[in-house]
Amino acid sequence: VPISSLCVGIYDGPHATPPKSDSGAVFLGISNFSNGRLDLSNIRYISEDDLPQWTKRVTPKAHDIVFSYEATLNLYAIIPDGFYGCLGRRMALMGPDERKVDYRFLYYYMFSAEWREEIERYKVNGSTVDRIPLVSFPSFTVNLPDMATQRYIAGILSELDDKIEINNKINDNLYSQAKAIFAERFINIESLPDGWQKGNLLDIADYLNGLAMQKFRPLDGEVGLPVLKIKELRQGSCDASSELCSPSIKPEYIIHDGDVIFSWSGSLLVDIWCGGTCGLNQHLFKVSSEIYGKWFYYFWTAHHLERFTAIAADKATTMGHIKRGELAKAEVLIPSDEDYKEISSLMNPIFNIIVANRIEARKLAELRDGLLRKLMSGEIDISEVSL
């Protein structure tokens, strides 16, 4: 059926940007899409006075589905309860008619192979960015089962998403606790405790740069490993578009769950990798130590990230980066053995739970994506699925 028959309306956002405001309503942007949800932790505001002008066409409400139609395509999210704001540029909205379609089913359908084929069929390849012609969007077709089947499929997939969301919230809380402990014990101190000493990042960890993986492609008969590049680090996982490398590379360049990775060129970031086994590309450091725990060198690297980013931006001609010499200039405080053991007894369990939760969330997402593909295509019957 045409998607227009399932919606009370389909609208695009404004083609301009309002003045910035320190408070008011949310001005949704493409950057607020995060893994199929809206991340409202970092938002741009629109003033109460300007809001009426920017909601003339449509006011987003709970259960509406927002999506991108230009530049970065195939971004979708459901407007949450209590949302107060307006659409931004390059965003559009569909309001599901809940008498005809379960809004959750319609949302999940956007991630199906059938819908992606529909997008590809209509997509306009521009000289600078791709776009979906919104004038044609109402005629895009949806394969719609009966309402009971819609609700069952949506319920299964939502349950998995809810479990992932719970894990993420637990981890956010744990990370905040660990960050606060680190700040209290290392950053917000007035003098160096007895037995402590000053050092630098290279004193507490090894920073191994990755390989130019285009030189290490899979050999005939080998099952390739996905390559960990900045894109994968940023999204927290590898995907079908990730490059492949030979599994015969030196073992130190093979990354495993729980490894600390520092991107030192382009987009500078440090994270604990939990996206499965892969090969380390150049422009990324694997950070490790035979003496100190992950929490110690992770937080010290993260502590200096803002300064590293400023240095990289200062040097940027095409792609900013930092040199290994900057690591040697980055000061750290090294505690006494006794104090290190005491702080580790707090930090190690937190880090272990964070890693376990992230691995579980990744596996739940893989299960969800596999079920979505099979349920939407009819490859498996809903009666065969239970969680």
Language-model features, listed with the residues they occupy:
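Amphipathic heptad-repeat alpha-helical coiled-coil/stalk segments that mediate oligomerization
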Residues: 386-387
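Sequence-specific dsDNA recognition surfaces
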Residues: 2-19, 31-65, 82, 88, ...
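Short coil/turn segments at secondary-structure boundaries
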Residues: 16-23, 42, 121-123, 197, ...
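A short glycine-rich beta-alpha junction/loop motif
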Residues: 69, 85-92, 104, 124-154, ...
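Non-catalytic DNA-recognition/assembly elements of restriction-modification systems
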Residues: 1-12, 139-212, 333, 337-383
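A short beta-sheet element
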Residues: 29-30, 48-112, 229, 249-306, ...
